[in-house]
Regions:
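Class II aminoacyl-tRNA synthetase-like tRNA-binding/catalytic domains
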Residues: 2-233, 418
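Polar/charged alpha-helical tracts
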Residues: 58-61, 261, 290
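An alpha-helix initiation/capping motif
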Residues: 140, 144, 161, 267, ...
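Cytochrome P450 heme-thiolate monooxygenase catalytic core
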Residues: 157-159, 263-264, 329
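A translation/RNA-centric and nucleic-acid-associated enzymatic feature enriched
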Residues: 173-253, 275-441
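Flexible helix-coil linker/hinge segments at domain or subdomain boundaries
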Residues: 250-264
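Short, highly charged C-terminal tails/helix-capping segments
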Residues: 262-277
Length: 441
């Protein structure tokens, strides 16, 4: 194989030239003396054309004998064809079979309908499908875009620990770890730690895995997921709502610019994403409750929402389906939110917090707040929540030595991917999802 190597994604740069493509057989169709193999290489799929009278017999026979997912190196001339996916085809002239999948043990995910349990059990192979590969490329783009957004806006990436000391927010949804005979837990959030780095660096963000031992089986829950969490010294609730608005519009725009073809492969209606631009609607918790109670009265919600409760998945789904942009629900009752949130000075029973609900019924993808700045108030809140003061001694120190107003939020990568890709379930948003009853593969 003497022709230069090209990825399928960049094959259009070589129109009229011979190239080498390294990948796998995705599909093979035969029509008389013509073979139409489809090759994939991770960057895309291209159709090859193999006329029997145009290649040596051994090349034709080798391609004809290929089985699904056999690994191959093919050489051919790139030809433009508007009818072809991607706009190009490959006139194959040579092939090297790296490994032929055995017919006695064929590739298990054949081109037919398979149940979800079967596909999840074979997740390591399901990733090779066009749809799953497209989702993972969109995921990578979202992560890259989030980093670019914060890096270009003066934020410093800081890395909080994944193993944390005992009982930071209660242990009911934490995964315990035996840490050299000390009790420790896998992190639920890097927030407390990046509050500390924000006091050192001003504007910071973290990106990493988080773990929640919640026995939830909803389409929105994973036990292991990834979050991007910014924190801003001297930042207010309004500041982070504006920041969240900027981040989400940036992510959507980037995916439309760079991953439109992948979104179309997934079947996403991109016209809905094209509507995502600032400003986003903002409603208070009180206004949200009114909308939910009206929805119940109209028969759209089964249960009547009672004031003072936190929003559940059906409530978020209903509210977010009322808008074609993300909606920012702010100022929840402090009693249903985390202990560290600053109270609203106008109504101290409310917290200066926000949940950003993605449209089309996708619900919460961002949660954030202004953090409590007073040492005395924070200490009281820790006691009120029956949390161990000693575990938070370092966190309380942040309020003793130059405390300032500060704010931040967390965005779940998987929920953002689900929304932008238009997916029904978050299990498709990460290569190997961890769920209540899913630890393999």
């Amino acid at each position: 194989m003497s022709a230069p190597i090209s990825t399928i994604a960049e094959i259009g740069k070589h129109e009229g030239q011979a190239v080498t493509v390294r990948g796998w057989l995705y599909n093979l169709r035969e029509s008389g003396k013509l073979l139409f193999p489809q090759f994939r290489d991770g960057s895309g799929v291209i159709q090859g054309v193999v006329p029997k009278n145009a290649v040596p017999p051994e090349v034709f026979d080798a391609i004809k004998g290929l089985t699904q997912e056999s690994s191959v190196i093919v050489e051919g001339k790139v030809r433009a064809d508007k009818r072809a996916p991607g706009g190009f085809e490959l006139d194959v002239s040579n092939v090297q079979v790296v490994q032929r999948v055995s017919e006695s043990d064929p590739y298990p995910i054949t081109p037919k309908e398979h149940g979800t349990d079967f596909l999840m059990e074979h997740r390591h192979l399901w990733l090779r499908s066009l749809r799953q590969a497209a989702i993972l490329r969109v995921r990578a783009e979202i992560i890259r875009a989030a980093r670019d957004f914060f890096d270009s806006n003066g934020f410093t990436l800081t890395d909080p620990p994944i193993i944390t000391p005992a009982a930071c927010e209660g242990t009911s949804t934490l995964f315990p770890v035996d840490y050299f005979d000390e009790e420790a837990f896998l992190t639920q959030s890097g927030q407390l730690y990046i509050e500390a780095t924000a006091m050192a660096l001003g504007k910071v963000y973290s990106f990493g895995p988080t773990f929640r031992a919640e026995k939830s089986k909803t389409r929105r829950h994973l036990t292991e997921f990834w979050m991007v969490e910014p924190e801003v010294a001297y930042g207010t609730l309004d500041d982070i709502m504006e920041l969240a608005e900027g981040l989400l519009t940036f992510l959507v725009k980037r995916c439309l610019e760079r991953r439109r073809a992948d979104l179309q492969t997934i079947g996403r209606d991109v016209t809905k994403l094209e509507k995502i631009e600032a400003p986003f609607p903002r409603i208070t918790y009180d206004e949200a409750v009114q909308k939910l109670q009206e929805g119940h009265a109209q028969g759209a919600l089964e249960n009547k929402f009672e004031y003072g409760g936190d929003l559940g998945s059906p409530d978020e789904t209903y509210l977010s389906s009322q808008y074609d942009k993300p909606v920012m629900v702010n100022r929840y009752p402090a009693s249903v939110k985390a202990f560290y949130m600053e109270p609203d000075p106008q109504r101290p029973e409310l917290a200066l917090c926000v949940d950003v609900l993605a449209p089309e019924g996708y619900g919460e993808i961002i949660g954030g707040s202004q953090r409590m700045a007073s040492h005395e108030q924070l200490l009281k809140r820790i006691h009120d929540h029956n949390l161990p003061e000693e575990a938070f001694r370092w966190y309380l120190d942040l309020r003793k030595y130059g405390s300032v107003p500060h704010s931040g939020f967390g965005m779940g990568i998987e929920r953002a991917v689900a929304w932008i890709c238009g997916l029904e379930h978050v299990r498709e948003t990460i290569p190997f999802p961890r769920m209540l009853h899913r630890l393999y593969p």
